[in-house]
Swiss-Prot record:
GO MF, any single term: iron ion binding
Keyword Iron: yes
Cellular component annotations (GO), alphabetically ordered: cytosol
Family the UniProt entry places it in: Belongs to the Fe(2+)-trafficking protein family.
Any matching Pfam family: Iron_traffic
GO biological process: cellular response to oxidative stress
Keyword field contains Methyltransferase: no
SUPFAM superfamilies, per database record: YggX-like
Protein name per Swiss-Prot or TrEMBL: Probable Fe(2+)-trafficking protein
Length: 87
C-alpha cells in the first residue's frame, strides 16, 4: 500500500486508497492525510452531525463540516460539542 507523511499524525502511514473529495481539497487530503486520520475524521464527523443535528441538504451545514474537517485534519483541532460524553 502507498504511504503518505500524514499532516495530522506527523508520521508515515498508509495513504487513503482514493481521493475522498473532488477538487483541490480532495487532492490535498489524498496526498497529505493518512487513511487512519481519514477514518478518525469520519467518526468525528458522525459525532458532529448527530450532536448538532445537522441537515446535510443545507449549504450552511456542509460549509460547517468542511471547516471542521480542515481544522481536524490539518490544524489538529478536535472540537467536540459541549454536551458530548463518550461512552
Amino acid at each position: 500500500m502507498t504511504k503518505v507523511l500524514c499532516k495530522k499524525y506527523n508520521e508515515e502511514l498508509d495513504a487513503i486508497p482514493f481521493q475522498p473529495l473532488p477538487g483541490e481539497l480532495g487532492k490535498k487530503i489524498h496526498s497529505e492525510i493518512s487513511n487512519k486520520a481519514w477514518q478518525a475524521w469520519l467518526a468525528h464527523q458522525t459525532i458532529l452531525i448527530n450532536e448538532y443535528r445537522l441537515n446535510l441538504i443545507e449549504p450552511k451545514a456542509k460549509e460547517f463540516l468542511k471547516e471542521e474537517m480542515q481544522k481536524f485534519l490539518f490544524e489538529n483541532k478536535e472540537d467536540k460539542p459541549e454536551q458530548f460524553n463518550e461512552i
